[in-house]
Amino acid sequence: MALPTLSAHWPSRVRTLEQQLVRQREQEARLRRQWEQHSQYFREQDVRSSKQAQWSSRQSFHRSMSAFQRDRMREEKQRKLEERRERLRTMLQEERDQLEAELRNIHPDRDTLARQLVEKTDALRSAREERRKNLAQELLREHWKQNNSQLRKVESELHKDHIVSQWQVQQQEKKQADERTQEEKQRFENEYERTRQEALERMRKEEENRKWEEKKRAEELLKQMEELKLREQEAERLKQEQETLMSKRWELEKLEDERKMMEESRRKTEFGRFLTRQYRAQLKRRAQQVQEELEADRKILAALLEGELDEQRFHKARRERAVADAAWMKRVIEEQLQLEREREAEFDILYREEAQRVWEKREAEWEKERRARERLMREVLAGRQQQLQERMQENRLAREESLQRREELLQQLEQDRLTLRLEKEQQEGLRTARIQEIDNQVEQRRKEQWEQQQTLEQEEAQEREELRLQEEELRLETDRMIRQGFQERIHSRPRSAWT
């Protein structure tokens, strides 16, 4: 019969344990690399989102527009400078041509000079006469216009129409200016609303991404918590299993002690029975004693078999042989117990001589069977002790591994909580900064609108004041002309053409 303590699967079990440790280390390294990649991705996304927010902000827009306006003004100034230079070159060229012509006409001959003087005198006389004639006609026409009531009425009507038309033109210009101002205001409001909507949309997307990331992290944390809970349950189960193994070990030791005590009692009883030489009663007592020993061995094997059956779901492959050996031993002991009961029934009909002979024969058989049983029981108990020791060692290693994994999970959970808190604080800071930026833009826009409104009101007040002054001046001039009545104009003597 093979010893149940020798396991042929021990090298494969060692290799399996080593492979599990290698896979666990590879999984931890893979999780660490994945965590580093995720952290790098989140950092890059934070930098990218901050840069995009900075580039799409109102300040960046103002800086771009200011740079564009400066470039346009610089180009406009350069163009105007080139135009002025071109005009100066043209004027210098004309002046140079005039100087050259004057230099050519500096020294004419006498005949030419006399002819030029005569022509100049005639031209001056003709021009003087023409001016006198034109002046006389102009004075007569002016006198006629001012003394003609119809023309004065027409002039008054034209002046009134001009004032009315100018008023309408001013109203039209004011209306157009108001419309342009309203359009500009509407355009700025639309631009501001569009910018605000873009900012809100960007913030909404960032909030959705943040919530999605928080949800994902919460799921990961939940998985880690579940794993931690499973580890704790595994540790508790291993602890209970350790306690069970210890109790079974104590039971085995107790059973071993009981067997030793029974053996000692049997030896003492044999010695007493040998002295009394009561073979028949001694045979019956010996048979009962053997039955008791067999019954005790059967109970021990039944307890071992029951324990082995309970542990089959954990170590089925390793326990099958031990269960089979224990079951075989139980059957053998039950057969011997039945045989001893039959022998006990035969003892009542034996005589003294035959009883002595049977006693010696049976004593030899019993001694042989006892030694065989003791050898088998020692093997079974030793195998059970070794199995319990192996189970306790495996349980201790599993508990240490579970505790180590639990510590790692707790550290990882603490690191995740710290990272999540820092990211929440950073997101809250960015959100507060963006809200402050939007509030500043709103306040700046309101200030600009208020300044524009104040400027428009001042311009309108100034226009109304100018119009009032013009109307007042017109009214005063009309009253003055009515009070003075008609007055003939005094024209000064026309100046001579020679002066």
Curated annotation (Swiss-Prot):
Residues 69-78, 172-209 have a biased composition (Basic and acidic residues). One of its GO terms (cellular component) is cytoplasm. It is found in: Cytoplasm, Cytoskeleton; Cytoplasm, Cytoskeleton, Microtubule organizing center, Centrosome. It comes from the Eukaryota. Its main location: cytoplasm. Residues 74-499 are annotated as: Interaction with keratin proteins. Residues 50-67 have a biased composition (Polar residues). Residues 12-38, 71-133, 168-306, 359-484 form a coiled coil. Residues 46-78, 169-209 are annotated as: Disordered. GO terms for biological process: apoptotic process. Residues 260-426 are annotated as: Trichohyalin/plectin homology domain. Pfam families: TPH (PF13868). Keywords: Coiled coil, Cytoplasm, Cytoskeleton. InterPro entries: CFAP53/TCHP, TPH_dom. Belongs to the TCHP family. May act as a 'capping' or 'branching' protein for keratin filaments in the cell periphery. May regulate K8/K18 filament and desmosome organization mainly at the apical or peripheral regions of simple epithelial cells. This is Trichoplein keratin filament-binding protein. The gene is tchp.
